[in-house]
Regions:
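N-terminal helical capping/dimerization or prosegment-like subdomains
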Residues: 28-110, 115-118
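Compositionally biased, low-complexity intrinsically disordered regions
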Residues: 9-12
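Short, Lys/Arg-enriched N-terminal segments with co-localized hydrophobic residues
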Residues: 14-26
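Histidine/acidic-residue-rich, glycine-tolerant segments that coordinate divalent metal ions
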Residues: 166-209
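Predominant activation on well-ordered alpha-helical scaffold segments within soluble catalytic domains
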Residues: 48, 78, 149-156, 185
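Active-site metal-coordination/substrate-binding segment of hydrolases
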Residues: 106-173, 179, 193
Length: 209
């Protein structure tokens, strides 16, 4: 026989549940921040390694549709993902991805490894990824290698901490964002899985769109 709760007791019970949920959420955020800080040096090294690759669009080759250096940058991040133990995929060297989690639905996190030409006027080596006064300098640090690699390490932190997620998370590495995003068009055209929802950690995310 069901027990009927009085309104006051029901309200109190709901309050207890919400308090517990908020507390667990806050604790998860704290653990996540601690884990990311713990991995900071490793993450910075990965950013440096990728920024050192001058992945400006080049002459297409049979296995490198956007040029050899763009493929090198893609291969580097796929290798990082494999070493972390993530599931990885490579769509004709145009889009790569790493994935974690279970479920029918997939959240897409779309970044890119290609960059615009180095240009002039740098105070520091654009491929050196130097840190001065708490700021990292290099082509792609902000657009979009740094944020993309940050997303990879955020996913690693979620996995390592065993935080609950109810759908798969896929971090995608585009290779032609700076020249029209034909890479994403190809991903869709060949029938790759589309996310249920997603976001792009590009440049000054989330302040610009």
């Amino acid at each position: 026989m069901a027990t009927r709760l009085c309104p006051d007791r029901a309200q109190a019970l709901i309050g207890e549940i919400l308090y517990k949920w908020e507390w667990e959420k806050e604790m998860s955020y704290e653990k996540l921040n601690e884990k990311i800080l713990e991995m900071k040096d490793e993450m910075f090294d990965t950013i440096r390694e990728n920024v050192a690759i001058c992945s400006v669009k080049g002459e297409p080759e049979e296995d490198a549709p956007y040029g050899r250096e763009v493929k090198r940058a893609l291969d580097h991040l796929l290798s990082v993902g494999e070493k972390m133990g993530f599931k990885t995929g490579n769509v004709d060297n145009r889009v790569g991805w790493i994935e974690y989690g279970e479920g029918e639905e997939m959240v897409g996190v779309l970044g890119h490894v290609d960059v615009v030409p180095l240009g002039e006027g740098w105070n520091y080596d654009p491929l050196g990824c130097e840190i001065h006064d708490g700021k990292m300098y290099g082509r792609g640090v902000q657009d979009d290698k740094g944020p993309t690699i940050g997303a990879v390490y955020a996913l690693k932190a979620i996995r390592d901490l065993g935080l609950p997620i109810d759908r798969r998370i896929r971090v995608l590495f585009g290779c032609d964002e700076e020249n029209g995003s034909s890479c994403v068009e190809h991903y869709i055209k060949v029938g790759e899985e589309l996310p249920t929802i997603g976001f792009t950690p590009d440049a000054q995310f989330p302040a610009i769109f």
